[in-house]
């Protein structure tokens, strides 16, 4: 007897998780505000081991956070394959005008003005999983 459509998640190394994260262009910034989880769509780039994220969130909401979480994934629902990576670490809002201008030129954004924020996350915890078809069960 063969079971079709079974998938399994396998944890990957931190190095592979960072490689997967580097291959993605968008994800979600996650933080807590008023005791509620907040998720914002975001784009990112991994530079010198730091994650630079552009997100439509107010800088004031993020600057009070000492740690932020970023999650990205690529899932092929029909094929039952893909991956997910979560990175958490200390973070700061990018305030240097030249650095901010550089990332605003290179990272596409959805919002402008007070809801267009750049943050740098120093990943300390990186966890990744691959989703794959399980071998046939007999």
What are these regions (language model features)?
Residues 24-56:
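Short beta-strand segments
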Residues 56-117, 123:
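Short, structured beta-strand-loop surface elements
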Residues 22-26, 64-65:
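A short, compositionally biased
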Residues 50-52, 120, 127:
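General beta-strand recognition
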Residues 1-21:
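Extreme N-terminal tail/first-helix region
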């Amino acid at each position: 007897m063969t079971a079709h459509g079974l998938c399994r998640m396998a944890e990957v190394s931190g190095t592979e998780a960072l490689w997967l994260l580097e291959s993605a262009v968008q994800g979600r910034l996650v933080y807590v505000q008023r005791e509620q989880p907040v998720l914002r769509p975001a784009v990112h780039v991994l530079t010198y081991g730091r994650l630079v994220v552009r997100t439509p969130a107010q800088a004031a909401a993020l600057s009070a956070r000492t740690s932020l979480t970023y999650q990205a994934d690529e899932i092929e629902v029909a094929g039952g394959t893909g991956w997910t990576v979560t990175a958490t670490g200390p973070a700061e809002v990018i305030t240097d005008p030249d650095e901010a201008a550089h990332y605003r030129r290179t990272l596409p954004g959805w919002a402008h003005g007070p809801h267009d924020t750049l943050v740098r996350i120093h990943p300390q915890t990186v966890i990744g999983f691959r989703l794959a078809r399980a071998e046939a069960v007999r």
